[in-house]
A protein has these predicted regions:
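Bacterial N-terminal signal peptides that target proteins for export
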Residues: 1-12
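Secreted/extracellular ectodomain signature
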Residues: 2, 24-126
Length: 126
């Protein structure tokens, strides 16, 4: 009976390891930012290039560019709600709350007066 318990434990550990490996393989993300509050993101891609392409394709504003790559974390973007074509900030962090706070602080640092988080996204870890 003890041997069966060990077999189940080994099988369970193997499944957990497989899930972790698959999760790590899908941990690429990207954030693209454009003018007047435009943004796009792509998360949970196997390849960074695919995440970048998804972020760019979802960014509907002009002059979009990928500003950051996420690996098992979160990205946030804040804009001045009264002037979305003015100040903005973005951040990438392993924790959503920190990414949001940093993006807000950067928006205020660049002259925003009424900054709000416009977008956020986390990959499978976040």
């Amino acid at each position: 009976m003890l041997g069966i318990g060990r077999s189940f434990a080994l099988a369970g550990a193997t499944v957990c390891l497989l899930i972790a490996v698959i999760g790590a393989a899908n941990a690429a993300g990207a954030l693209a930012v454009g003018v007047c509050g435009a943004y796009g993101y792509g998360f949970d891609f196997r390849k960074e290039t695919d995440a970048r392409a998804a972020a760019m394709s979802k960014c509907s504003g002009g002059s979009c560019k990928v500003v950051g790559v996420v690996r098992r974390g979160c990205a946030a973007m804040a804009v001045d709600s009264k002037n979305p074509c003015g100040s903005f900030g973005w951040a990438i962090n392993s924790h959503l709350g920190k990414a949001e706070n940093i993006s807000m602080r950067r928006c205020f640092d660049f002259g925003g007066r009424d900054c709000v988080v416009r977008a956020w996204a986390c990959d499978e870890k976040g």
